[in-house]
Regions:
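Extended, well-ordered alpha-helical scaffold segments
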Residues: 6-9, 62-73, 137-153, 198, ...
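Acidic/polar, glycine-enriched structural segments that form the non-catalytic walls/loops
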Residues: 1-41, 59-64, 70-80, 210
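The feature captures the catalytic groove of carbohydrate-active enzymes
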Residues: 24-40, 88-140, 154-213
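Glycine-rich (often Gly-Gly/Gly-Pro-rich) flexible segments and glycine-rich loop motifs
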Residues: 42-84, 187-205, 210-211
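Extended, hydrophobic/aromatic-rich amphipathic alpha-helical segments that build helical scaffolds
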Residues: 3-17, 118-127, 143-153
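Alpha-helical support elements that line or immediately flank enzyme active sites
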Residues: 13-16, 47-61, 115, 119-135
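Loop/turn elements at helix/coil->beta-strand transitions in domains of secreted/extracellular proteins
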Residues: 2, 9, 59, 134, ...
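Structural recognition of the beta-strand scaffold that forms the well-ordered cores
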Residues: 5-6, 13-15, 52-53, 61-65, ...
């Protein structure tokens, strides 16, 4: 009974906080003009945790404002990839609000090095398709976003001496590698797994639609 109440409470909060925009850090309950962290969209943890509830709660329509916001910032995401990493495709920053440019630079939190954003959000696109089986959505919205995310890795990844691809620089949000004073690292597990999930999903989606063969 307790777990059911917790689920229902979370579902109520998420539905209430979602409108034409996805829920930000404080939802609609900030009650101040200066909320913590500016009440932004923290994309490297907070926002994905919230939107991951949508499909489980049988509210797939609430995913659409997230996709609308991401697609509105596609040109900014392309600027991030090109100007910061000299790569094709898109780079979703660790935070955004009124634009999608990656301008959060900090000596302690190397958020610029977080690579998993576009890949992680691509998985939400593919999850939405798997839940709804909407092939028009897969063709017109999901796969184009996923392809742009994959293009980034085509340029970014370099092959190491052992034949394996290297993610460098890399960053797992708010995690310090062992025996290191810096959170910046090489081959953060989060970055590797996000790219793995993205590329597998691109292959599956392409097979479903009969494209990219």
């Amino acid at each position: 009974a307790l777990v059911e109440k917790l689920f229902d409470a979370a579902r109520y909060n998420v539905i209430s906080a979602t409108g034409i925009n996805p829920p930000n850090l404080q939802g609609i309950w900030g009650a101040t003009m200066t909320p913590p962290w500016s009440g932004d969209y923290t994309t490297n943890g907070n926002l994905p945790v919230v939107v991951s509830h949508y499909l489980q709660a049988n509210t797939p329509e609430l995913m659409l404002p997230l996709f609308d916001r991401l697609e509105a910032y596609m040109e900014d995401f392309k600027v991030n990839a090109r100007e910061l990493f000299n790569c094709q495709g898109i780079h979703v920053p660790s935070r955004f609000s009124s634009h999608g440019l990656n301008n959060h630079f900090d000596a302690t939190w190397p958020m610029t090095f977080w690579l998993a954003g576009a890949a992680w959000y691509s998985l939400f696109y593919y999850d939405y398709y798997m839940y709804t089986l909407d092939k028009d959505f897969l063709r017109e919205r999901a796969l184009p976003f996923m392809e742009q995310a994959a293009l980034f890795y085509e340029d970014f990844l370099k092959e190491g001496n052992d034949g394996k691809y290297i993610f460098n620089p890399s960053y797992s949000p708010e995690n310090n590698p062992a025996n290191s004073s810096s959170q910046a690292c090489v081959n953060a597990t989060m970055d590797v797994m996000a790219a793995n999930g993205l590329l597998r999903s691109v292959i599956e989606a392409s097979q479903i639609l009969g494209v990219n063969q």
